[in-house]
Amino acid sequence: KLDFSKDSTLSLLINYVETGKIKIVLSNIVVKEVEKHIVRASEDICSAFRGLRKEVLKIVSKGLLEQIGVKTDLLLLDKEKYQEKSLDVWRKFLENLNPEILDLSLIDLNDIVDDYFDIKPPFESGEKKRKEFPDAFIANQIRKRFGKDEVIAIVCNDNGLKKACGNSQNHIFYKTLGELYNAINIQETEYKNVFQEI
């Protein structure tokens, strides 16, 4: 679930960015994927409220509800309005995150087409190949932007994408943001302990 509220897991990222512990790098593909999910979620919210209104009106009349102070029209949300409000929350979060956003100029289409026909990750033989193209683009962006020498943390729970990023020991994968946060906190604690011993 996407949650950009003050105490959410995602908002902790902003704290780590502001303290200089991490720098966020996102593929423009990831940004577009998040926007797509936000739009879909806002549509689902509006549909759920409309459904709730419909169910309530099966139980009692609109007139009775109005007499007791329940305004069922409040449940008729404007889909476009709430999509835009939801996207505004995302844009504000992104602004506070201040990420480097990798664009498509880093992508080498020849490499991706070769990987596709050679069935190299993320194009593994048992999966629907067409759906793996976004992962291939993201992995290609990571390889082009960071190479194999720069140490980077990648939050990803997709084995095909992990393999496609290459086998660099400097690419450290975490399945969740929580795992990344724990690693940062452990490293920070170890650093403080070493510093205190000196």
Pin down the residues of each PLM region.
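Active-site-proximal, substrate-binding regions of enzyme catalytic domains
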Residues: 2-151, 159-198
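Conserved nucleotidyltransferase catalytic core and NTase-mimicking acidic/glycine-rich helix/loop elements
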Residues: 154
